[in-house]
Amino acid sequence: MQPLVLLLLFILCFSGLGQPGIINNDLQTLLEVKKSLVTNPQEDDPLRQWNSDNINYCSWTGVTCDNTGLFRVIALNLTGLGLTGSISPWFGRFDNLIHLDLSSNNLVGPIPTALSNLTSLESLFLFSNQLTGEIPSQLGSLVNIRSLRIGDNELVGDIPETLGNLVNLQMLALASCRLTGPIPSQLGRLVRVQSLILQDNYLEGPIPAELGNCSDLTVFTAAENMLNGTIPAELGRLENLEILNLANNSLTGEIPSQLGEMSQLQYLSLMANQLQGLIPKSLADLGNLQTLDLSANNLTGEIPEEFWNMSQLLDLVLANNHLSGSLPKSICSNNTNLEQLVLSGTQLSGEIPVELSKCQSLKQLDLSNNSLAGSIPEALFELVELTDLYLHNNTLEGTLSPSISNLTNLQWLVLYHNNLEGKLPKEISALRKLEVLFLYENRFSGEIPQEIGNCTSLKMIDMFGNHFEGEIPPSIGRLKELNLLHLRQNELVGGLPASLGNCHQLNILDLADNQLSGSIPSSFGFLKGLEQLMLYNNSLQGNLPDSLISLRNLTRINLSHNRLNGTIHPLCGSSSYLSFDVTNNGFEDEIPLELGNSQNLDRLRLGKNQLTGKIPWTLGKIRELSLLDMSSNALTGTIPLQLVLCKKLTHIDLNNNFLSGPIPPWLGKLSQLGELKLSSNQFVESLPTELFNCTKLLVLSLDGNSLNGSIPQEIGNLGALNVLNLDKNQFSGSLPQAMGKLSKLYELRLSRNSLTGEIPVEIGQLQDLQSALDLSYNNFTGDIPSTIGTLSKLETLDLSHNQLTGEVPGSVGDMKSLGYLNVSFNNLGGKLKKQFSRWPADSFLGNTGLCGSPLSRCNRVRSNNKQQGLSARSVVIISAISALTAIGLMILVIALFFKQRHDFFKKVGHGSTAYTSSSSSSQATHKPLFRNGASKSDIRWEDIMEATHNLSEEFMIGSGGSGKVYKAELENGETVAVKKILWKDDLMSNKSFSREVKTLGRIRHRHLVKLMGYCSSKSEGLNLLIYEYMKNGSIWDWLHEDKPVLEKKKKLLDWEARLRIAVGLAQGVEYLHHDCVPPIVHRDIKSSNVLLDSNMEAHLGDFGLAKVLTENCDTNTDSNTWFACSYGYIAPEYAYSLKATEKSDVYSMGIVLMEIVTGKMPTDSVFGAEMDMVRWVETHLEVAGSARDKLIDPKLKPLLPFEEDAACQVLEIALQCTKTSPQERPSSRQACDSLLHVYNNRTAGYKKL
């Protein structure tokens, strides 16, 4: 009965309204709205009530109706319901709607313009969705709206000027979108607005002065944009403003003194702009100010004395400016409330004043990256509220006081890179809240105190590079939260404490480069989270404990250079290895099959052990393997066929084993192979011709085997080969003429074989031969080719123990580079010229016909008799032949001279310029430039001049310290880059230069720019290098060029592209340093030399060019100009050594990596006069939050969390590359490994989303 009554009442109420159309309209509209909203089928449907069976829609989830009895929908609150789908235009039909909240869902698509029909709307909340498109300008008609919050979406385009019509607006929140364009000056008409939130967009242009009219404004934040211009003084009129945040923009000029008139201001952040000038004293008048952050600008002068009187100030952050002076003794004289004082990187000098102890409320003190000297004052340890103390990168000295025990709230103690010495006080045990202890690169000595184990909150300990001695305290095992223990490069002795196995959170354990002994404790097997185990360069011994098999998360292990033995099987529990190094130990037994389970393993080093058995076939499963070193073991059997699947192999070293069988023909399928070392084994049979398909081979060492047959002509295919060692085999037959094609050979050893025939004259074509030419202990006959004397770099020549005849060519004696010469035990004769006297007699023994210094003097009479014995007829014949030969050569030289002179003048013409239209002629047009095979066809001088309009400026695409670069589009459709070298000499006539450039031209790598050819004109002083053209310019252009044509490109240079470029750069440098023999030092790595092809792949240019030019210039040439164009990239040691090394290249590469991530130039003004990019990155990387966030180029934002992590990892690698000491920098190969690790794990974060 009761339900029936209720139903009748409900019907009467509705019929009494007389408004069935209105009811049906709102009901129908709600049902239509629902059609565009999608709920998660895995969860309870929050809109299950929204259906036509339930016409009481006022009770539906999120629906609110008015209380007038008309049942009109006035509010829809669907926030946080996990909705997907889109916003339906039907929302615009709720005529009486006052409040619409669709925030915190996953809605996509545009904001419908139909929402502008909601003329009664007072609040519109669409924030935290995935909405796209532009903000509809029609929203400017919502004149009753008070709160408009549509941020945290994917919205693009400009902020509509029509929003200035919303005169009742109190809150406008458009943060965290992708909005562009200026802040509309029309927003200055919003006189009632209280909150204007525009941060984290791409807004640009100046801040409109009209915003000073928004008199009710209490919050204005436009941080994380691209705003420029000056801060308008009119903002000083905002007397009600409490929060002003303009951080991370490009604002310039001085800070207006009028900002000191905002009497209610509590928070002011202008950090990370380009502001300059003095800090206005008027800011001290802001009596309510609690936070002042002016860090990372170009501010100068001293900190105003008045700041220390601001009684309400809690946070003062002035880091990374160009301030001067020292900390005043008046600090905190009238302000004991200061909690955060951050003055890092402000060029402070002098000592830390004892008066700092007056800041009794101080929680964070950061004075790092300055020039502070003296000791840490005892009074500093009276700041008992301190949680963070950063004093690193100064020149502090003295000891660490035991009074540090007073700082019982301390969580971060960072003192690295100072000159602190003495013992680490045992009183540190009182710091029970300490989480991070960084003391590395100081002069601490003595033992690490046992009491450190009482600091039970410690997560990271880094004491690398000190003089700590004694044993590692077992008490460290009590640190249950520890994830980093880095004690490398100290003087620690004794065994590894078994108690370290209790540190179950350890990720990195690095105890390398000490004097540790004993065995590895079995308790290390409990370190289940361990990722890196570095124990190399110690004296550890014994078997590996079986428990290590439990370390399934290891990615890097290095136990090299110890005395360990037994089996390595306990290390094979992980299938996540990236690098595995146990070289130089005494490991025995067979190589475990399980090593093949780490499919991302890049480098496997097992050399110099006592491993036995066969090479595991399972290694063929490691498709990422690039280096395999099993040298100096006792391995037997054949090389397993499965290794043919490791297509990325670049280095194979199996030297000094007992491997047998023929050399596998399938090795020829490893197209990336650059180094093959199979020396001192038991390989037999002839060389497979397939092996010579490995055209990237740089080192081929097969000596000490039983290989036979002849050396095939196909060896000439190995044009990149630097080292060829076939010593101590059974090769026979003659030396192939194709050997002369190995023009990059640095070392050639063919001794102790059975080679016959004459030494081919083509051997003289090996102009890069330097280390050795050893043909000893063979059966070579005939004369020594005089062409050997042209090998101007050769240091060792051994032709001993052959059957050579004739004289020793005088040109050999003229070889200035030759240090070792041995032609003993041949059948040589004649008189040695005086040039040979610099070698000992042993070099010529066993040649009965030889005489002269350093051998016995020639018998003049016997010599004359022998000459007479030739007969007068012979002498006449020989003289006649010599005379005719000399005349013939003279005629040939004269003819060639006139021909070249004729061709030259036909090429350059006779006008005032070298490149007139008359320069083309039938003969000249067919004279090609030198080229290295990279071009489609011969490139002619005239082609280049025509394509560039005689090197006109309109075709110039770049310039630098070495010259200008032009783009040349040739008639054959090919595009090349032409570099005009600014050098006064005719470089191409310099044989040394010509040889070096030809060598560089033969270098091929996917991340190096190909040098295609060169030419010069002596009369015009022009030297041209022809390079492969890179369509997308340099990474410098993309990061720093302000031309409008690049604006769209900047948006395309996303994090994925930048990371790929960073890896490509590192791979190019690694190739130069580790895969070229001899290694090539680039000398001028910078972002403008990192070029991008059409696929945005990185190619390093100008490699080797600086060295070639500086070594081939006259004494008046200032070679340092090669570094003048690279300021900001130069390693610090170059300033005093003036010597470029691989480690100085690594430093320059580190700077480029920082540039790629931060988007800043190495000399960016944000660093200040006394701080460089390295210290700036280091300063911000070591702190969390906004300071770290500013390291990432704003153009990359927003990034996903794991992308930000990857960016920070790249910066950490860059910091390692830019260590002050070259010895502490990684090799380019190690840096490349680290970057590849970041790149290969870049998608891991997607799985967590």
UniProtKB/Swiss-Prot annotation:
Designated name of the protein: LRR receptor-like serine/threonine-protein kinase GSO1
Record-listed Phosphothreonine modification sites: 948
Phylogenetic lineage: Eukaryota, Viridiplantae, Streptophyta, Embryophyta, Tracheophyta
Active site: 1084 (proton acceptor)
The keyword Membrane is annotated on this UniProt entry: yes
Positions in the Extracellular compartment: 19-876
Swiss-Prot/TrEMBL catalytic activity: L-seryl-[protein] + ATP = O-phospho-L-seryl-[protein] + ADP + H(+); L-threonyl-[protein] + ATP = O-phospho-L-threonyl-[protein] + ADP + H(+)
Function statement: Together with GSO2, receptor-like serine/threonine-kinase required during the development of the epidermal surface in embryos and cotyledons. In coordination with GSO2, regulates root growth through control of cell division and cell fate specification. Controls seedling root growth by modulating sucrose response after germination. Receptor of the peptide hormones CIF1 and CIF2 required for contiguous Casparian strip diffusion barrier formation in roots.
Residues in the Cytoplasmic compartment per record: 898-1249
Compartment(s) where it occurs, according to its Swiss-Prot or TrEMBL record: Cell membrane
Organism of this sequence: Arabidopsis thaliana (Mouse-ear cress)
One GO term (biological process): regulation of root morphogenesis
